[in-house]
Structures are given as C-alpha cells and as structure tokens.
C-alpha cells in the first residue's frame, strides 16, 4: 500500500510557504499570530 505522505519540497513551499501565506488574508493572519506568539519559524 502506498503511504499518504510523499514528500516534495516544491509542493510544500507552494502550499505552506511564506509567499503562499501572504497571498490570502487568512494566511497573513496566520503569520501575524505566529509572530505575536514568537515562533522561530513563521512558515515552511
């Protein structure tokens, strides 16, 4: 049986990357929340 997680750096960055987050209002909210929490990594 094929596993569900088939890693790909390109797909990861395109879906969860910083620029992808900045494109939508909700994504910007995510970045803001992570900034206020003091996360070391804001996005993938």
UniProtKB/Swiss-Prot annotation:
Cited PROSITE patterns: RIBOSOMAL_L34
Compositionally biased residues, Basic residues: 34-44
Keywords tagged on the record: Ribonucleoprotein, Ribosomal protein
Region called Disordered, residue ranges: 22-44
Any single biological process term in GO: translation
Molecular function terms, GO-annotated: structural constituent of ribosome
Family of the protein in this entry: Belongs to the bacterial ribosomal protein bL34 family.
Protein name: Large ribosomal subunit protein bL34
Organism from which the protein derives: Laribacter hongkongensis (strain HLHK9)
Gene that this sequence comes from: rpmH
